[in-house]
Amino acid sequence: MIKIRRGLDLPINGKPNQSIEDGPQVRQVALIGFDYQGMKPTMAVKVGDRVKLGQELFADKKIEGVIYTSPASGVVSAIHRGDQRVFHSIVIDVEGDDALAFNQYAAADLAGLSAEQVQQNLVQSGLWTAFRTRPYSKSPTPGSKPHSIFVQAIDTNPLAADPAVIIAAKADAFANGLTLLARLTEGKVFVCQAEAANLPKGQGANIAYESFAGVHPAGNPGTHIHYLDPVSASKTVWTIGYQDVIAIGELFTTGRLNVERVVALAGPQVDRPRLVRTRLGANLDQLTQGQLKAGENRVISGSVFGGRRSFGNLTFLGRFHTQVSVLLEGREREMLHYLRAGFNKFSVMGIFISKLFPSKTFDFTTSTNGSERAMVPVGSYEKVMPLDILPTQLLRSLIVGDTETAQKLGCLELDEEDLALCTFVCPGKYEYGPILRNNLTRIENEG
């Protein structure tokens, strides 16, 4: 077991009840372009077309053979683009239950399938895009093989669902999914789980179960990769979420694409925080209707640390998100706040009197408590960075765009979520996720 001691468990109110209920029915779903790094779509449908569940919507111009399929049966109601025609989302009005059929196998035969058979079914169904490479967090090229595959079956994000609860309800599908993943690599399939978790076992001598404990980011794939199989410019691993492993298992045994998603609907502004059963790409306005407390609320697809604000063309559940967080917009300014003891305020540096009450939780808002300013190295990054890197030096190199130094300091191991805590504790209010992504894009483009 690997114990993470440096990090942060955010003391936020609104933790979800860990039991699954059916969520409000959604009438719209969408695929969001920003969920797929560097993807350039070639559309296979247009507005007004009727599509089936699992039908191709578009292909990736940059990665030959990768297609993106419909998460519902219905009608394409909108294709949204932004400045310079950047793809935002493709929206489908859910109607009927028509679905494409894919190759189906008996559970007993899965361990005997070839890597080519597994890959073909995943690519044709669109589930291939559930994998993300590290470095760069892109969909892998069909035909490629990773050094290892990481299954994220632990989640330490604030307000997250307990993966063990969701996996227990689909134990056979999860085990079948692991068996299939083992066919895709000659290396290890690392199933990263919480301490004392008893997850279903797949068939494959290369499947390894690794336990992590401690504070967030103990559940991040970046943390698992760093300790178990670090990457480099010449070494690639893949990551995949536990609910996608379940979907893979069900695809092969039923021949039908499973788009069910269990998400944690939680946060200080949620009336009844709990786990709800919905579907991939669900419209979050419809999912949260009648579920929130009064006030100006911000609905977030994903974690409060690194999720995406739900608004306009992006009012949908992200492809890789398993929670919907809701915070009150923090627009009010507090007079003479610097003279107050801060009983109802939180600080990583322990400068408020609330530090004397370690079990206290808070109604966090969206306020950043200040504007952007110079980066000040006061030791806050080191408090929340569990990886064996120099965070202050790395962040400085990212800010100034020194990609050579950033690579030497370990930026290729990282994704946006791995720097989310650094953003949260930053005295200068920098958003390190987008800064990291800009540097990674430059590194990849420059070869």
Swiss-Prot record:
UniProt enzyme class: translocase
Translocase as UniProt keyword: yes
Taxonomic superkingdom: Bacteria
GO biological process: sodium ion transport
Coiled coil spans: none
GO molecular function: oxidoreductase activity, acting on NAD(P)H, quinone or similar compound as acceptor
InterPro entries: NqrA, NQRA_2nd, NqrA_C_domain, NQRA_N
Alphabetical UniProt keywords: Ion transport, NAD, Sodium, Sodium transport, Translocase, Transport, Ubiquinone
EC number: 7.2.1.1
Enzymatic reactions: a ubiquinone + n Na(+)(in) + NADH + H(+) = a ubiquinol + n Na(+)(out) + NAD(+)
Matching PANTHER family: NA(+)-TRANSLOCATING NADH-QUINONE REDUCTASE SUBUNIT A
Annotated family: Belongs to the NqrA family.
NCBIfam families attached to this UniProt entry: nqrA, PRK05352.1-2
Subunit structure: Composed of six subunits; NqrA, NqrB, NqrC, NqrD, NqrE and NqrF.
Functional summary from the UniProt entry: NQR complex catalyzes the reduction of ubiquinone-1 to ubiquinol by two successive reactions, coupled with the transport of Na(+) ions from the cytoplasm to the periplasm. NqrA to NqrE are probably involved in the second step, the conversion of ubisemiquinone to ubiquinol.
Annotated protein name in UniProt: Na(+)-translocating NADH-quinone reductase subunit A
Origin species: Cellvibrio japonicus (strain Ueda107)
Lineage: Bacteria, Pseudomonadati, Pseudomonadota, Gammaproteobacteria, Cellvibrionales
Gene that specifies this protein: nqrA
